[in-house]
């Protein structure tokens, strides 16, 4: 199958029948240049993320939301934005993972059941992929569970392979940890130091530490993989920053990784702008979408006090908050909530109203955030600089946003999105200071 460049339509490769368990067939490598030309094309470097659906530690962890983004989305964003690859692929056996991969712009290789077992290795899946992609010369196997990966890391490794002639490069992190031998009853009754002299314990600043694989990626040329290696030949490591070295394996890793990715993760090519306006849909974001009617036929709605506090905090930080609804909500009822927010109801074209508000405040779209949950919010969500949706938003809204809340609408989603805005604004301010 021919590869497609980044940004082109996604495609799927589907192994037919059982793949060969041996080495891929040797290719007849003619000149990689065009017909009648002696100039060779650069080797085809493909990013490959392995993401089977049968994870035992955390079910479907590859698409579980981490900081509002499917886990696999963090590394796909970094790989696609790096510009280092001729193609970016996800190898999976699961429909939901395939759909998420396509949404982010990756191509999909449907792996066979033979390499989707608990006993299958990464090498098995990579060899199967190469069996169906003769155009690929180098594979960058990127781990979906490393969400703090940045495009610059991948660009530098691609350069090491292409320009410096390395056959394989893998990621490491430097650690300053003293290691001791394990005590085993009947074998070793006392422990011994493995990498230090206890009589001369070095200070951290006086010790270079040691290099450990962090599992973020393994790049290798095709001929090595065909021989059964991901590390070999002219080999080198790439040292990643400690704060970017995150690996998720079990549930306990998740909250730690979430905090790390919010502070050190890669959020895309577009430079973040300071948010000046947040627009929230009323029904399903401010409220849970339920409407109660009193005995005298008056409309009653409820909202979460946490969301009111979130709105107050946003306003205190200088961010205008406005409310919008396509329904003919009672302004009197909304006013009784004492949120002190400008609002528009019975809106048939939300994008037009938000655009008017934006122009009124002299803002560009990148300075506007939007929290929506319905199909009618889709265009606004796609247009603004920062978009979010409650956990129970419709699928159309969720597909259009950059952040999906853990909280449902009317149950803390606004407060959660406010905290997300504050964290991103902190990143903006820090980058400006640098």
Curated annotation (Swiss-Prot):
Keyword 4Fe-4S: no
Positions of substrate binding: 52, 62, 111, 120, 122, 143
Positions occupied by motif BC1 motif: 15-31
Coiled coil (UniProt feature): none
CDD domains cross-referenced by the UniProt entry: CMP-NeuAc_Synthase, HAD_KDO-like
Enzyme class: transferase
Modified residues (Omega-N-methylarginine): 37, 52
EC number: 2.7.7.43
Domain of life: Eukaryota
Modified residues (N-acetylmethionine): 1
Chain span(s) of sequence motif BC2 motif: 200-206
GO biological process, one term: N-acetylneuraminate metabolic process
Disordered as annotated region, ranges: 1-42
A molecular function (GO) term: N-acylneuraminate cytidylyltransferase activity
Catalytic activity: an N-acylneuraminate + CTP = a CMP-N-acyl-beta-neuraminate + diphosphate
Pathway recorded for this protein: Amino-sugar metabolism; N-acetylneuraminate metabolism
Keywords: Acetylation, Methylation, Nucleotidyltransferase, Nucleus, Transferase
Residue window of motif BC3 motif: 269-276
Biological role stated in the UniProt entry: Catalyzes the activation of N-acetylneuraminic acid (NeuNAc) to cytidine 5'-monophosphate N-acetylneuraminic acid (CMP-NeuNAc), a substrate required for the addition of sialic acid. Has some activity toward NeuNAc, N-glycolylneuraminic acid (Neu5Gc) or 2-keto-3-deoxy-D-glycero-D-galacto-nononic acid (KDN).
Quaternary structure and partners: Homotetramer; the active enzyme is formed by a dimer of dimers.
Family that this chain belongs to: Belongs to the CMP-NeuNAc synthase family.
Comment, domains: The BC2 (basic cluster 2) motif is necessary and sufficient for the nuclear localization and contains the catalytic active site. The localization in the nucleus is however not required for the enzyme activity.
Protein name, as recorded: N-acylneuraminate cytidylyltransferase
Organism per entry: Pongo abelii (Sumatran orangutan)
């Amino acid at each position: 199958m021919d590869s497609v460049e980044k940004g082109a339509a996604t495609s799927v490769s589907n192994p037919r029948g059982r793949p060969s368990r041996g080495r891929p067939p040797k290719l007849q490598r003619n000149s990689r240049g065009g017909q009648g030309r002696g100039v060779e094309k650069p080797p085809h470097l493909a990013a490959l993320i392995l993401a089977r659906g049968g994870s035992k530690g955390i079910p479907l962890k590859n698409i579980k939301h981490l900081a509002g983004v499917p886990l696999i989305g963090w590394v796909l964003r970094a790989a696609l934005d790096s510009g280092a690859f001729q193609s970016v692929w996800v190898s999976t056996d699961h429909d939901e993972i395939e759909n998420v991969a396509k949404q982010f712009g990756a191509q999909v290789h449907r792996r066979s059941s033979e390499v989707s077992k608990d006993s299958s290795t990464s090498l098995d899946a990579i060899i199967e992929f190469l069996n169906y992609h003769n155009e690929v010369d180098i594979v960058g196997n990127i781990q979906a569970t490393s969400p703090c990966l940045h495009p610059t890391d991948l660009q530098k490794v691609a350069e090491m392979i292409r320009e410096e002639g390395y056959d394989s490069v893998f990621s490491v992190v430097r650690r300053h940890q003293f290691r001791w031998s394990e005590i085993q009853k009947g074998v070793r009754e006392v422990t011994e130091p493995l990498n230090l002299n206890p009589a001369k314990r070095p200070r951290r600043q006086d010790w270079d530490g040691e290099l450990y694989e962090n599992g973020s990626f393994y790049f290798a040329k095709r001929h090595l993989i065909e021989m059964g290696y991901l590390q070999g030949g002219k080999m080198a490591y790439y040292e990643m920053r400690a704060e970017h070295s995150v690996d998720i394996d079990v549930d306990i890793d998740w909250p730690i990784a979430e905090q790390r990715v919010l502070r050190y993760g890669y959020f895309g090519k577009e430079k973040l702008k300071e948010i000046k306006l947040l627009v929230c849909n009323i029904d399903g974001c401010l409220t849970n979408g339920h409407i109660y009617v009193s005995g005298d036929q008056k409309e009653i709605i409820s909202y979460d006090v946490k969301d009111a506090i979130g709105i107050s905090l946003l306003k205190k930080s200088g961010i205008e908050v406005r409310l919008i609804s396509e329904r003919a909500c009672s302004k009197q009822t909304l006013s009784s909530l004492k949120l002190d927010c400008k609002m528009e109801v019975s809106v048939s074209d939300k994008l037009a109203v938000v655009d008017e508000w934006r122009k009124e405040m002299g803002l560009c779209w990148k300075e506007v955030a939007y929290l929506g949950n319905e199909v009618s919010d889709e265009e606004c969500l796609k247009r603004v600089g920062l978009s979010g949706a409650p956990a129970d938003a419709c699928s159309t809204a969720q597909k259009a946003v950059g952040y999906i809340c853990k909280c449902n609408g009317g149950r803390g989603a606004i407060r959660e999105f406010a905290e997300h805005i504050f964290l991103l604004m902190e990143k903006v301010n820090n980058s400006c200071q640098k």
